[in-house]
Structure formats: C-alpha cells, structure tokens
Amino acid sequence: MCIPRRSFLSALPAAACLGAAGVVFPSNQAEAQDFRGFIAGVKAEGRRAGISDTILAQALNTLSPNTRVIELDRKQPEFTMTWERYRSTRLSEKRIAAGREQAARNAQLLMQVENAYGVDRGVILGIWGLETNYGAFQGGFNVIEATATLAWEGRRASFFRAELMAALKILNHGDITMPRMQGSYAGAMGQPQFMPTSFNRYAVDFDGDGRRNIWDSVPDVLASIANYLLKSGWHQGQPWGTQAIAPATIDPSVAGRENRLSLAEWARLGVTLGNGQRLPASPLPASLILPDGPGGEAFLAYPNFNVIRRYNPSDFYAIAVGMIGDMVMA
C-alpha cells in the first residue's frame, strides 16, 4: 500500500475514502484531447513492457478522468488527529470482536501462513482489520481509472504512472479482471490495500489457483500481508512492542523511534510495563513512543514496530495494528 499521504491521513488505512467512483468526462475539448494523448502514450509504454493489445484496449479505450479522484487527492485535512481520537475510532469493540471471529474461523490457515513466513498472526490480523475491516470495505474506485486520472492530472504524475503501468501488468498476468480491480481513490487495492507496485512485489498465490487474488481469496490476502512484512525485515519470534508507563518527569527528548535503549536502561529512567510491573530482561532494543506527547499513553516499540511502519509510515497505525493483534489473540 505505501503511498505518500498528508498530515493525519498518514494514520488512516488506504480504504478510508471509499466514495463511489463516477466517470467524469473532461470539461472541454482541449482537456479531452490532452487525455487522449496521455492514453496513447500509456499504450505505447505498455506495449514496450509486453502488455497485450487486448488488455490495453479493454483497460484504456473507453477510459475518462474522474474528477472525484482528483478532488479527494487534493483535499487538505482540516485538523490534526490525536492518538486518543484515532484509538477510539480504530480500536472499536466491533473491530476487535470481528477480528476474534476471523482468528477462530481461519485458525488453521493462519497457522499455515505463520509457519510459511514466520510473521505473527496477530499482526497479520491487525493489518487486515485496520485496512479494510477484514475485507468488508475495499474501496469503490476502479484502480485503472484512478491511477490513470492521477497520472494524467500531473501533481504526482511519475508516481501514479508507475502505479498505472503496474496495474496494467496485473491485468495482463490474469490475476484479476478490470471490473473487479477495485480499490481506494489513490489505487490501493483489495483487502490488504496494496498499491499495484506493491502487489507485484509482495502478493502471493497461497491457495494455488494460479492467481494472486487479494480481493476475494483469504489465503492469498493473509499470505500476501505476511510476505510484505517478511520482505520488509520482519524478525521472527519477536514482539512488535508493548504498552508502558513513563513517568511524567521523563525527558521528552529521549522519546521517539530514533532513540533505542535496552529495557534495563528504560527501567532506570522509570519506565514500567503498562500494568505497572517491572520491565522484563530482554536483549531487544526499544524506543519509547509517546503518541500524544508527555502525560499521555506510552509504548515501548521493538524493531518489528518499524517493519509495520513500512506498510504504513505512521506511529498511530503501527501501534493500532499491534494492539488489535494483541487483543484479538488474547
């Protein structure tokens, strides 16, 4: 999924903006001609990349830019999201209950995925739950249309042109049909909300049907999330982090992902577990995360915390993924 986002939107899953996709034709003849020229260039690039003329025609011949996509991409947030507010909306009782249901329903599959990739099943469930509520909300935009619109619109043309080409390669490979290739307005796709380039790097066919189907195949979804984390540096058998209590007098400058201390050093600074007990003996380095600053909740983040952030570069997101996983598997 890894797409640049602004302000508090960096803490939101990619499917957060799920407005229905409506084709909007260019407003004047010059724009229409410009878009046709853009599509001609995409077709030429696609042919050079080995994409069939049939796929290029099916995907691009009737395509028009979608102004709703442009509106959502340009929309600026009106406030800064606090961790307290983010937690209250993302870690709902309903989401946790649904996660426990999925953990029970897919227990054998999760064990197989965990054994194959060495990634903690709780974190896999946390990402699945946070991205699309376990597949319930995958986004309603056609990915080809969305990425083509943003590549043509120009503000991040090179980024989205690469995503458009990657999406065309997915169609050419036969993993999914164009009508089913649905996602967010920015092109994040399916249940794990992979960007097309991420799909081509990390998506796997775990159910053995010959297609990497992150829209409808739960085995492919869970294994693809695990593969993403594994290839991002996941440390097998290590936790993501833990809730903690930091004294109100602690120097705020020691907090942050850049500062890594041993648990013994954190203990000497007065940090305890979230239940008030002493920190355990462990060789793992940890960073103190204060998502709402001094006086708010505190977390000790281990190296796997930063691996989760490679899925979405937000402390809020990584903490929420870890907490959902912990609560679902408790």
Predicted feature descriptions by range:
Residues 1-16:
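N-terminal secretory signal peptides and thylakoid transit peptides that target proteins
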Residues 25-32:
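Sec/Tat signal peptide C-region and signal peptidase I cleavage site
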Residues 33-105, 111-114:
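An acidic, Gly/Ser/Thr/Pro-rich helix-cap/linker signature
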Residues 43, 168, 226-229, 322:
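Non-transmembrane alpha-helical segments in soluble domains
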Residues 51-60, 120-126, 179-182, 212-213, ...:
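Surface-exposed patches in mature extracellular/periplasmic domains of secreted proteins
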Residues 88-217, 222-224:
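Acidic/His-rich structured neighborhood in mature extracellular/periplasmic domains
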Residues 178, 185-190, 195-278:
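Flexible, glycine-rich surface segments
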Residues 250-330:
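C-terminal soluble interaction/assembly domains
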